[in-house]
Regions:
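C-terminal catalytic/substrate-binding lobe primarily of soluble NAD(P)-dependent oxidoreductases
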Residues: 3-4, 9, 146-385
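Beta-loop-alpha module in the N-terminal Rossmann-like domain of NAD(P)-dependent dehydrogenases
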Residues: 67, 77-93, 108-109
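Conserved N-terminal Rossmann-fold NAD(P)-binding element of oxidoreductases
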Residues: 12-17
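Hydrophobic/small residue at the entry helix of a nucleotide-binding pocket
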Residues: 19-23
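NAD(P)-binding Rossmann-fold cofactor-contacting core
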Residues: 32-49
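ADP-ribose/adenylate-binding Rossmann-like module
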Residues: 93-111
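Rossmann-fold cofactor-recognition segment
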Residues: 53-66
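Rossmann-fold NAD(P)-binding glycine/threonine-rich loop
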Residues: 105-127
Length: 385
């Protein structure tokens, strides 16, 4: 096993050009020696580059796993914008070629299984480096470090940590949501149980929308519900051992009125009829699309409140609230720019080999947040105590 990553070659392979591919790709065209965009066909890759204003700045390629593997060299970086089930085989090809790997998705079991081999080969595996997951991790690490410095790591305390993120229409519609890609993923996420800490107790919401609560951000009311499994992040975020969670939840943010507007959808989800839900996804895509005339909005609020007793309290919150433009959606900006930032740090050899989830350390998180702010991803920090 090596503690040193394979030296970067300077070549970046960006695989896939979906709706989350934005100005992050342009950043890599500025910083990497060579960029190759892999798409379904070479023509589609050329069209995607032209649409992004990057014609001639990256080499178009027709993607198959075999075609990519044939061009991989040691130290190349593969950026996967493909669905998560594709990441395991793609990482396997990277490990074999001793090429680095980066994505914005949660760590899948297939990626986790290959992580030891990647580290042994000197391959960096950067994951969870988009918006959510990604920027949310940076915010959490920064808040925890600040609170620990203020309260003390050895001080007994209780805390509440909430992390809510949502992509919503900038101008609310009656449905309180618009679909920028296939709704099946949104619907199936609502069918998955959510596990989190509430009132100091581990809680599971079998139907996450039933746990929806009002959530106020700077005077604006949203609706928030838990999503996926929050509990593993207790260990991942490394809060002091003497601090006990009152509430710890990572979840989804929606516009006020969403719960009521979606009542007919929830009734369909309750039936657990896969065929009907697939049909419903197609219906919703047609009824509530995000068109070229629409603008999206991304809101990410991460809050930490720590109570050490005797009036000793600390509270901090990061808020990101961005609206898309005609040139780039807010979601594309917030996913592609942190991912590209992570890739630049693979290129400059500042990331170690093995599995990483975004920046992971408080020091690296602070550095990345400074760089993201300089790169146009705006956010605000508020601290009390």
């Amino acid at each position: 096993m090596t503690d040193d990553a394979v030296p970067a070659s300077g070549t970046v392979h960006w695989v896939g050009a979906g709706l989350s591919t934005g100005s992050g790709l342009a950043k890599l065209c500025d910083t990497a020696a060579r960029v190759r965009l892999w798409h379904r066909t070479e023509e589609r890759a050329e069209e995607a580059l032209a649409a992004l204003g990057l014609a001639g700045r990256a080499e178009p390629r027709a993607y198959t796993r075999a075609a990519l593997a044939a061009e991989l060299a040691p130290g190349d970086v593969v950026v996967s914008m493909l669905p998560a089930p594709e990441h395991g085989p793609l990482l396997a090809a990277c490990v074999e070629a001793r090429a680095h790997f980066a994505c914005s998705s949660y760590v899948s079991d297939a990626v986790l299984e290959r992580a030891p081999a990647a580290r042994a080969a000197g391959v960096t595996v950067l994951t969870e480096a988009g918006l959510d997951p990604g920027i949310d991790h940076l915010f959490a690490h920064s808040l925890i470090a600040r609170a620990t410095a203020a309260i003390g790591p050895g001080t007994a305390a209780s805390y509440t940590l909430t992390s809510y993120c949502g992509g919503v229409p900038a101008v609310p519609n009656d449905f309180r949501y618009r679909f920028s890609w296939a709704p099946a993923g949104v619907l199936n996420a609502l069918r998955a149980p959510a596990r989190y800490i509430e009132d100091g107790t581990e809680t599971t919401a079998g139907r996450p929308w039933r746990a929806t609560r009002p959530y106020v951000v700077d005077g604006e009311t949203f609706e928030a519900y838990p999503n996926r499994d929050s509990v593993p992040f207790l260990a991942q975020y490394g809060l002091p051992a003497g601090w006990k969670p009152r509430t710890f939840v990572r979840g989804t943010l929606r516009l006020d009125g969403w719960l009521t507007a979606w009542a007919p959808v929830f009734a369909e989800l309750e039936r657990d009829d896969d065929v009907r839900i697939a049909a419903l996804a197609a219906e919703l895509a047609a009824l509530h699309p995000m068109t070229e005339a629409d603008r999206d909005r991304v809101v990410l609020a991460v809050t930490l409140d720590v109570d050490a007793g005797s009036g000793d309290r600390w509270s901090g919150r990061y808020l990101l609230d961005l609206t898309g433009t005609a040139e780039e959606s807010a979601m594309a900006r917030c996913v592609s720019r942190p991912l590209a930032l992570g890739v630049t740090h693979i290129l400059d050899a500042s990331l170690p080999p093995g599995l990483l989830r975004a920046a992971e350390t408080p020091e690296r998180s602070e550095s990345w947040l400074r760089e993201l702010a300089e790169d146009g991803v705006e956010f605000a920090l508020r601290v009390e105590g």
